Amino acid sequence: MSLEKRWSLEGTTALVTGGTKGIGHAIVEELVGFGARVYTCSRNEAELRKCLQEWENLKYDVTGSVCDVSSRTEREKLAEEVSSVFNGKLNILINNAGGYVNKPIDGFTAEDFSFLVAVNLESAFHLCQLAHPMLKASGTGSIVHISSCCAQIAIPGHSIYSSTKGAINQLTRNLACEWAKDNIRTNSIAPGAIRTPGTESFVIDKDALDREVSRVPFGRIGEPEEVASLAAFLCMPSASYITGQVICVDGGRTING
């Protein structure tokens, strides 16, 4: 395979959940930039319409629909729509959509637990099941989960969130082993603190930001594009022998205690 083809996504199809903001938005644009056709979803219809219009103006090949990934019925509908748009073949699945609740362990409710498991773990597991026939039909499939460095270090207030991401990391390894026979690779990206709408309150709190940055060898928080570039690489032919891995994009946060 030529160098150009090894570093291209030309002609591929991708589903990116939660693609209207933050890391998901950056991944959508990164994949399109390397030649992929992308389908995305958001539970916020207004945000989705705004993004789709912006991408249309830029002549990006992106389509999408409203979907709350915590709903099994809506996930099934999403898979049907993706299959219809891409004629039953999908090369790339990016499980990015997720949720976050920050509380001390004794402050969590049963509803908090159910919500986080549904949106962070069950949704990814089920979407992999739904996408499997399409990924297999494409001949070369790549699944990328957006996990978190919180699954590798203990951070107060993150107990349930971190547990769901730890489960995602193990799911990654199981999928990699079971679906290699179908030429489907699975990897996880574990970001540290990234500048996204979901971390705005953290970034605004200068003391909290300073404390976090002090633990990062690079001395700053990350940008969504720094996660998106790895996501794109993991889906390329260049990464064809990489599977079952959890890769931190955290400026060295997890190696610094």
UniProtKB/Swiss-Prot annotation:
Which EC class does it fall in?
A: oxidoreductase
Q: Which residues bind NADP(+)?
A: 20-23, 42-43, 68-69, 96-98, 161, 165, 194-199
The coding gene here is NR
Name recorded for this polypeptide: Noroxomaritidine/norcraugsodine reductase
Q: What is the lineage of its organism?
A: Eukaryota, Viridiplantae, Streptophyta, Embryophyta, Tracheophyta
The family database entries (InterPro entries) matched by this protein are listed as: NAD(P)-bd_dom_sf (IPR036291), Sc_DH/Rdtase_CS (IPR020904), SDR_fam (IPR002347), TR (IPR045000)
State the pH dependence.
Optimum pH is 6.
- Positions bound to substrate: Y100, C149
Identify which residues the record assigns to the active site.
Y161
